[in-house]
Curated annotation (Swiss-Prot):
GO cellular component terms, A-Z: nuclear envelope; nuclear pore
Keywords recorded for this protein, A-Z: mRNA transport, Nuclear pore complex, Nucleus, Protein transport, Repeat, Translocation, Transport, WD repeat
Signal peptide: none
Transmembrane region(s): none
GO biological process assignments: mRNA transport; protein transport
Subunit field text: Part of the nuclear pore complex (NPC). The NPC has an eight-fold symmetrical structure comprising a central transport channel and two rings, the cytoplasmic and nuclear rings, to which eight filaments are attached. The cytoplasmic filaments have loose ends, while the nuclear filaments are joined in a distal ring, forming a nuclear basket. NPCs are highly dynamic in configuration and composition, and can be devided in 3 subcomplexes, the NUP62 subcomplex, the NUP107-160 subcomplex and the NUP93 subcomplex, containing approximately 30 different nucleoporin proteins.
Name assigned to this protein: Nuclear pore complex protein NUP43
Repeat region (WD), residues: 132-173, 177-215, 225-265
Domain of life the protein comes from: Eukaryota
Region (Disordered): 51-73
Species this protein is from: Arabidopsis thaliana (Mouse-ear cress)
Subcellular localization, as worded in the UniProt entry: Nucleus envelope; Nucleus, Nuclear pore complex
């Protein structure tokens, strides 16, 4: 396994609360960086979305920790289960991005952040009630145009759209009536998305076709060797026929929709014996394609993927290559985000009430 920690400086910054999730916000200017955290205060059992600014070089000194300032917050009705940046649908682009917070009580809230006026939270929309989700909303993904898809432990799949002046409108795509549960979702096209949950199974849905999923990777391919839950899914914007998934026992695998019956296992259960040092053997909480790591492989191979795990590893996995370890923390890494505008920059939320920020060379 290749180690890269010595090639860049990692800044670990304590927080006053547990950080469930973290996402970069669009860069509104050359000087200011902003990010959102889903924070949980165990002392008073309250959860919030906090908007924070980051100055990577306070007072022009490159040798000091970045300066982080909390600018605004919004109190959630229950613990935040999914934090996402809601694209530009209905928002003001880089200056007024939207952030969505899904909750453990089954609601979805959309906040508009004014980065010009001190990151004030100007307004919010909500979708809630028993007709929306019953119980925890596990996964949310947005696409351009202000439309998202939500999945939950209740087995429901909803498509939600921001309607200016009216709030959120949603329609139910599927209701598993509690017999199935979904943990992750990702758009593949304006009409198609992929879901994942228990059993290392993935499902492709097409909004043009009602009812069941139009294709699926059955969850029994791992032959019951371990508990199997998909926690995160990502789809590369230029290769929408291939999605990547991360889950239990350090497992990261790809599903090529052109050959839907067999996964391409990159790490964990069923991985190639040529990989001597698996990146992780615990729960993989998040996966994202990493556009910053250059690959010279052919178009038939899987592009590099960044992952974080319960055993504190943040690293990069590429098909047929030894994994690269970026961070090895003494606690779980709950989530991470690669800055879309500056993909060398990565931010992580750590189990021990802190965040880690670094910029790759």
């Amino acid at each position: 396994m290749e180690m890269m920690q010595d090639s860049f400086q990692v800044h670990r910054i304590p927080q006053s609360k547990y950080v469930d999730g973290v996402r970069w916000l669009p860069q509104a200017s050359a000087l200011n960086r902003f990010f959102a955290t889903a924070s949980y205060d165990a002392d008073c059992d309250s959860s919030s979305i906090e908007i924070q600014s980051l100055d990577p070089n306070p007072r022009g000194n490159h040798n000091t920790n970045p300066l982080i300032e909390s600018l605004s917050s919004w109190t959630s009705p229950s613990r935040v289960s999914s934090l996402e940046v809601a694209g530009n649908g209905g928002g003001g682009g880089s200056f007024k991005p939207m952030v969505s917070a899904a909750t453990s009580s089954g609601s979805l809230h959309v906040l508009m952040i004014d980065l010009v006026e001190g990151a004030a939270i100007e307004e919010f929309y909500a979708a809630e009630g028993e007709r929306f989700h019953v119980g925890r909303v596990e996964g949310v993904d947005w696409r351009e145009g202000g439309e998202c898809v939500t999945v939950g432990e209740d087995g429901r799949v909803n498509v939600v759209k921001i309607v200016n002046g009216e709030g959120l409108r949603y329609r139910k795509v599927f209701d598993g009536n509690g017999l199935v549960a979904y943990r992750a979702v990702k758009w593949a096209s304006p009409t198609e998305f992929v879901t994942g949950g228990y059993g290392f199974g993935l499902q492709l849905w097409d909004q043009r076709k009602s009812g069941e999923a139009v294709s699926q990777l059955k969850g029994n391919w791992f032959q019951g060797k371990t508990s199997a839950i998909v926690h995160s899914i990502d789809i590369h914007p230029s290769r929408k026929h291939t999605c990547i998934a991360g889950g239990s026992s350090g497992t990261v695998f790809a599903w090529d929709l052109r050959w839907p019956q067999q996964p391409i296992v990159l790490s964990g259960v069923g991985a190639s014996e040529n990989i001597n040092n698996p990146l992780s053997e615990s729960e993989v909480w998040e996966v994202q394609y990493d556009s910053y790591t250059k690959s010279n492989v052919s178009s038939s191979r899987i592009l590099p993927v960044m992952t974080c795990s319960e055993d504190g590893i943040l690293g990069i996995i590429e098909q047929g290559e030894e994994p690269i370890e970026l961070l090895a923390e003494p606690c779980a890494i709950n989530s991470f985000d690669i800055d879309r505008q500056n993909p060398q920059d990565v931010i992580c939320s750590l189990e021990w009430e802190s965040i880690a920020v670094f910029s790759r060379p």
